[in-house]
């Protein structure tokens, strides 16, 4: 590395650390007090620790005080509390106790701590022979206290099947202990996992902890062909106890033609799933010891499928009065094959004394929106749900959902089915609900150039007897103080959301797919003279919302404009627009990106001669397509774990069905096979960036995660080597332990540091440009 390059690395790394060091809000809980005008909020905070290559986790508290004139005051704890080695924290319903989870490593037990308001009340060590680490991801994760706060249900890795044991005489029938060194364990049968992110993780299984005794029991009656998650307790029965557990189950026979295979589940809501019910394992002793003639007791049998009539059901939530079970469904994704699509919301009227063999009718609350009118509700697109989403009226739930290129907060009246946007309608910022506080909402808002700010929303009555939501800024927020340097670095930037008309729409397109798509434009002062980065999301059925991103903000601070395109196929714009892309990848999405670029060029917003492009996954697919199909329009490119050759990916990825869906469209499901036909392999190749590699001119930086199961490194390496063979300028960075996201802290840091240096080198940004 020459002196000039070394100086650039030093300068940019110092700048990037300013963005990396800022804390993030991961979640929050609100607890009521005896005073109805006061409550307490607990925040889960994380901060990147580059030296340790992990994230620090903190807990921070604030007291929320209101009065009759709607004045609001937040009193913050003086310092956050660091939670070393903690995998998850979950408060009890009353807020008087806290479960602290410390997942074991390398065969050590999992530690479950019950903390009250003054000390650790109990510490339970769960041996690996009972279960492995608890799931804390966004999909299988589920930890649920019962109302009496005596039992905790949770999802953990099941213990692996016993391995065959051998010694110098051959096979040992009786097995062996871990301490016996005179033998060795074989491998046994291969046990498939859920692909990307879940490599080497055990089967997600349901367990219940009795806090008083410290005993842990596995739920019974659940087939080993079912992976479970998102557990909640059903309301108390007539006996006054909560006897039943409700959970989500994913059948493992979801391969082609219903064959046994766990197709990858990360980022894929199209995996069939149902709500199930089973008896709490600590109720079984009552059943087993009862007289055979006692017909009032239910047998401890198999788990019951509560939603057999719908192909997808997840995020179960009971209303506060226990009369409704509400859940989301991705049945449109399951039925169409798109890996994400428009969600729907449903409810079940829950009987006060339900029996496991009792039929439950499903009613629609929010249906799928096909083609939204301009400015109207586009449908539900929810990647998560609050553990307690209910306002104090007991019939209104709070959801966070994508709404075109923004994220908004919605209130849903589950009785009438009315969806209302309660975050400001005239705001291009993105909003996300953190917690419900009675009839109020604690939230966070941000933009591409504004770090997250905590907001507090409450309803105000108007003269016409209607209500509106008012959002107050939270005073003395210590998290904002940590972001002051970042705000100063972005103070000369602005952003807007552009509506991009579809050019020359064909007659065979649906109405929804002819409507404008959008791009988020982050610009410097005098943007027309600054270089621009075209930023492309993956999926293709994911969305770039107008929220704060540390890495995007870093690139903007270097003096780049950012054009972040939500091409057709992006969630948040109605189902017709989303479904217009499958079967047309490499053409429709490529054209949308070029149309967005033309829009800002023709508007005089950017310099057409200074354009770079970057994307991850399907965004990398588009990046490598664009530099091949439009080689004279891009000076430089960077691709992170890109899809470059579908015909190679089909045999190596954890989601081969994705290859059929994006290339073949609606016909993909019927043709999908583990042994693609020559015609399909030819089609996959024709729709891939590698088909255009001979035309590439732009220098390309390729960043690969060595442990990526979604787009294995063979895909990127084949393209990179083929480009090098043709004399192209290519630089490869490999992160051996990283998965598809490349999100290990040091890898993430080094990735974007090199992207910044690479782009500045090939776009010739001066120091004065970056500071302007």
Curated annotation (Swiss-Prot):
Quaternary context: Homotetramer.
E.C. number: 3.4.19.1
GO BP term (any one): proteolysis
Keywords: Cytoplasm, Hydrolase
Biological function: Catalyzes the hydrolysis of the N-terminal peptide bond of an N-acetylated peptide to generate an N-acetylated amino acid and a peptide with a free N-terminus.
Gene3D superfamilies for this protein: alpha/beta hydrolase (3.40.50.1820)
GO molecular function: omega peptidase activity; serine-type endopeptidase activity
Predominant localisation class: cytoplasm
Active site residues of this protein: 617, 708, 740
Compartment(s) of residence: Cytoplasm
Organism: Oryza sativa subsp. japonica
Segments traversing the membrane: none
Catalytic activity field: Cleavage of an N-acetyl or N-formyl amino acid from the N-terminus of a polypeptide
PANTHER family attached to this UniProt entry: ACYLAMINO-ACID-RELEASING ENZYME 2, SERINE PEPTIDASE S9 FAMILY MEMBER
InterPro entries with a match to the protein in the record: AARE_N, AB_hydrolase_fold, Pept_S9_AS, Peptidase_S9_cat
Class in the EC hierarchy, top level: hydrolase
Protein name (record): Acylamino-acid-releasing enzyme 2
Family the entry assigns: Belongs to the peptidase S9C family.
């Amino acid at each position: 590395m020459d002196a000039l390059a070394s100086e650039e690395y030093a300068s940019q790394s110092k700048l990037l650390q300013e963005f990396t060091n800022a804390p993030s809000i991961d979640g929050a809980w609100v607890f009521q007090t005896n005073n109805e005008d006061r409550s307490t909020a607990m925040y889960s905070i994380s901060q990147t620790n580059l030296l340790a290559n992990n994230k620090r986790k903190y807990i921070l508290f604030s007291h929320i005080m209101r009065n009759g004139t709607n004045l609001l005051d937040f009193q913050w704890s003086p310092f956050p509390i660091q939670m070393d080695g903690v995998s998850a924290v979950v408060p009890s319903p009353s807020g008087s106790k806290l479960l602290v989870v410390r997942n074991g490593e390398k065969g050590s037990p999992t530690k479950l701590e019950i903390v009250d308001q003054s000390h650790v009340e109990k510490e339970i060590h769960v041996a690996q022979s009972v279960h492995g680490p608890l799931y804390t991801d966004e999909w299988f994760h589920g930890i649920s206290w019962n109302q009496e706060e005596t039992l905790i249900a949770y999802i953990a890795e099941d213990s692996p099947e016993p391995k065959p044991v051998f010694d110098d005489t051959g096979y040992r029938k009786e097995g062996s202990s871990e301490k016996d060194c005179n033998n060795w364990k074989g491998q046994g049968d291969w046990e498939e996992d859920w692909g990307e992110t879940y490599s080497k993780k055990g089967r997600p299984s349901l367990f219940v902890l009795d806090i008083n005794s410290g005993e842990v029991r596995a739920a019974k009656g659940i087939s080993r062909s079912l992976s479970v998650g998102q557990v909640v307790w059903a309301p108390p029965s007539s006996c006054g106890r909560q006897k039943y557990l409700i959970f989500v189950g994913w059948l493992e026979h979801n391969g082609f033609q219903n064959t046994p295979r766990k197709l990858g589940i990360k980022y894929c809501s199209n995996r069939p799933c149902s709500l199930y019910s089973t008896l709490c394992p600590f109720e079984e002793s009552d059943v087993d010891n009862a007289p055979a003639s006692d017909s009032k007791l239910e047998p401890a049998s198999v788990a019951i499928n509560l939603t057999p009539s719908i192909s997808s059901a997840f995020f179960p939530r009971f209303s506060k009065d226990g009369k409704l079970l509400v859940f989301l469904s991705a049945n449109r994704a399951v039925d169409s094959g798109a890996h994400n699509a428009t969600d729907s919301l449903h409810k079940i009227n829950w009987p006060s004394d339900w029996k496991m063999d009792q039929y439950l009718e499903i009613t629609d609350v929010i249906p799928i929106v096909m083609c939204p009118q301009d400015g109207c509700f586009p449908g539900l697109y929810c990647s998560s749900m609050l553990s307690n989403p209910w306002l104090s009226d007991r019939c209104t739930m709070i959801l966070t959902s994508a709404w075109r290129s923004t994220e908004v907060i919605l209130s849903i009246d589950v009785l009438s089915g009315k969806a209302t946007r309660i975050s400001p309608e005239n705001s291009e910022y993105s909003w996300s609900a953190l917690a419900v506080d009675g009839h109020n909402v604690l939230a966070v808002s941000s933009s591409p150039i504004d770090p997250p700010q905590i907001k507090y929303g409450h309803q105000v009555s108007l003269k016409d007897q209607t209500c509106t939501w008012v959002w107050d800024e939270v005073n003395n927020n210590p998290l904002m103080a940590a972001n002051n340097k970042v705000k100063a670095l972005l103070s000369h930037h602005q952003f807007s959301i552009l509506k991009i008309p579809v050019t020359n729409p064909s007659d065979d397109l649906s109405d929804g797919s002819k409507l404008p798509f959008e791009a988020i434009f982050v610009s410097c002062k005098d943007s027309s003279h600054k270089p621009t980065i075209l930023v492309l999301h993956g999926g293709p059925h994911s969305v770039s919302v107008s929220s704060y991103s540390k890495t995007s903000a870093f690139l903007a601070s270097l003096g780049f404009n950012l054009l972040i395109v939500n091409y057709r196929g992006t969630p948040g714009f109605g189902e017709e627009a989303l479904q217009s892309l499958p079967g047309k990848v490499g053409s429709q999405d490529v054209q949308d990106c070029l149309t967005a670029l033309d829009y800002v060029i023709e508007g005089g917003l950017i310099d057409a001669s200074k354009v770079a492009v970057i994307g991850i996954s399907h965004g990398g697919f588009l990046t490598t397509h664009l530099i091949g199909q439009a080689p004279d329009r891009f000076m430089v490119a960077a691709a992170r774990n890109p899809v470059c050759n579908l015909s190679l990916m089909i045999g190596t990825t954890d989601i081969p069905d994705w290859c059929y869906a994006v290339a073949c469209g609606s016909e993909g499901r019927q043709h999908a096979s583990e042994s693609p036909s020559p015609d399909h392999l030819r089609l996959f190749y024709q729709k891939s960036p590698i088909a255009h590699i001979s035309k590439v001119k732009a220098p390309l930086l390729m960043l690969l995660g060595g442990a990526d199961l979604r787009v294995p490194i063979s895909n990127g390496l084949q393209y990179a080597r083929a480009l090098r063979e043709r004399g192209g300028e290519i630089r490869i960075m490999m992160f051996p332990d990283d998965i598809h996201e490349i999100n290990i802290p040091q890898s993430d840091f080094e990735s974007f540091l090199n992207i910044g240096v690479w782009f500045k080198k090939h776009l010739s940004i001066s120091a004065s440009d970056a500071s302007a």
